[in-house]
Amino acid sequence: QACLDHVFQRRIASCLVNPRAGHETELRYEPAQTRKRFAVVGAGPAGLACATVLAERGHQVDLLDSAATIGGQFNLAMRVPGKEEFAETLRYFRRRLQVTGVNVRLGARADVPVLRAGRYDEVVLATGVTARDPEIPGADAQRDSGRVLGYADVLLGRYECGPRVAVVG
């Protein structure tokens, strides 16, 4: 992670969780002059940070995600050996959501009727990323057999890897 990697490289520390880290005197969160209703769509790292900062500034915030839990890709990342500390990051955000008063709506699809019904002043889309397909010729024919896998297939235990593995991408 950038927090330690940058320090060891004698660069300014940065943080995946706290965008102000290393810039506390420059990046100040001022109270909002006009309180607004925000919908933040996506409860991954970006959505969590956005929702809590907006609420901290005095806005009314609904955080919507179709998943049953917060975290987005962090829920996969913390399954990687040596990356278990991401679970602590999610614990931190759960607490921040409580303290800042963000209204968390899990299992909620944020389609147009839902967003219109919410009468939001602003909508922030923080829906995250999907894995890039390296478009290897012939790979599509091998996916169903488990011979070509995405990282989520392995981390979620859908398939086991054999003794010989090539990582591409």
What residue ranges belong to the model's regions?
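Cysteine-cluster motifs in flexible loop/terminal segments that predominantly coordinate metals
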Residues: Q1-R35
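Glycine-rich dinucleotide-binding loop and its adjacent helix/turn
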Residues: N18-P31, R95-R96, V104-L106, T127, ...
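Beta1/beta-strand and adjacent pyrophosphate-binding region of the FAD-binding site
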Residues: T34-A46, P163-G169
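Beta1-alpha1 glycine-rich phosphate/pyrophosphate-binding loop at the start
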Residues: V40-N103
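Catalytic cores of nucleotide-enabled group-transfer and carboxylate-activating enzymes in metabolic
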Residues: A51, E84-R91, R105-A110, R116-E122, ...
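Short hydrophobic core segments
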Residues: L64, Y120-G128, V168
